[in-house]
Amino acid sequence: MKLFQRDEAYGMMVRDLKTAQSVSYAVPAVLEKTLREYQKIGYTWMRTLARYHLGGILADDMGLGKTLQVIALLTAFYQEKTEQKAAGNEGSGSELPLPSLIVCPASLVYNWGQEFARFSPGIRVLLIAGTAKERQEQLEEQMRMEASEGAQVIITSYDLLKRDRAAYLGRTFEYEIIDEAQVIKNAKTQGAKAVKEISANARFALTGTPVENRLSELWSIFDFLMPGFLYSYRKFRERYELPIVKNQDPEALTALRRMTGPFVLRRLKKDVLRELPGKEERIVYSAASGRQQKLYTASALKLKEALAGGAWSGNGKLEVLSQLMRLRQICCDPALCFEDYAGESAKLETCVSLIASASAAGHKILLFSQFASMLERIQERLLQEGISSHLLVGATPKEERSRMVQAFASDEVPVFLISLKAGGTGLNLTAADIVIHYDPWWNVAAQNQATDRAYRIGQEKPVTVYKLILKDTIEENLLKLQNAKLALAAQVVSEGMVSLGDLSQNELMELFEQNP
């Protein structure tokens, strides 16, 4: 794979990028009235990079239309090639245009296809799906076709690309675009290796969180975009990661931002969507008592003793993680981990009361939890109060998922209960104006993406986000730890997350400060 070279063309490109807003690239007529001004800037930015066969990270906030900006880029490219051919002016080369490849999570493959059909129906799109034999036939047929007849855009998932990687090697694409690029944050995974093996003239990565926890994640994405630009990982770690993370070196941070800045475009909703109504976040506390408090105290003490005994640095990590999960479940509702528990859950009662008041006032509510079993308990309690709800978890069939999403926009059901992992991406639920996070999740980016199911283009009402916290527990201290960990990601590029596996023993102990 060709490594990035800092040459004269690179200097010209940087100068062009500094004046990207003044560079004139015609927006495809089919999208001229659809693209917002900031999306046109994103389109121009990508075209400027592509002109020099370079890549970048489109890191806009969730809901700002990263997909649409890419559709504009690809539509412009293939329309211009078609027009050049019709005019008999193909430049110095006679080759037909190469197809482009989009790689995304499996849950978004059909969404990409639908977006092309909606916004740029003239682009020929091939969705890779089916059995191994069917996929092989799809790709072989594509290769047999002339570029003027075959698909211009091929869309596949990370998992299928890994399985079919041999079919892609030996051919070159015009663009390779990876969606939800945080999937390749670990450079050692087969998924990361597979996308980096593809030959393409220009590459782009779409993600709202290019840095979730470690700077190595940013390095891995740049290793996909322009191998060698941030050097080898060993050199990057010595020059930037260690000085910034361990020593808070401002010079290293400034140097890294200066290097990556031209290749990362990040816009926030509050900056570009002036018409988007406000968003307010509130923390709602509950206080455990009785048996719930006793169970939490005993479990927290047991875990503190294990940590003090060095369990986190030995072979006991899995047991520590298991006990942490149990503590979180006790905060949600002790019945999640104690079958014979018949007492109250302070947070559940607070939650039901909040939903009852909101639904009575005519609001529609999204509620997210990591635990599907907790969502089922909430649904049962709501039924006791005469409140109906939809429930979406990982096991929900795709057809039922689509039906519920469509129904929620128009039916009288006021509550949509969604597991965090099942509903974090690919849903548009702007009918809701209240979002409840029942339990704090280590991954703040996932929580924010969940909130953006409601707070996005199309939302006409102010949105209120409630985070439910059990006071004087691990949940309360987790919020403090998240803020500290997020600071690094915010300094470099974006928002971030806390990964339990990355915490030191001292940081784990801090989760229990001022708690039993």
Show which residues each predicted segment covers.
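ASCE P-loop NTPase motor core, strongest for the SF2 helicase catalytic module
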Residues: 3-248, 257-516
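Long, charge-dense, solvent-exposed interaction surfaces that engage phosphate-rich ligands
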Residues: 253-255
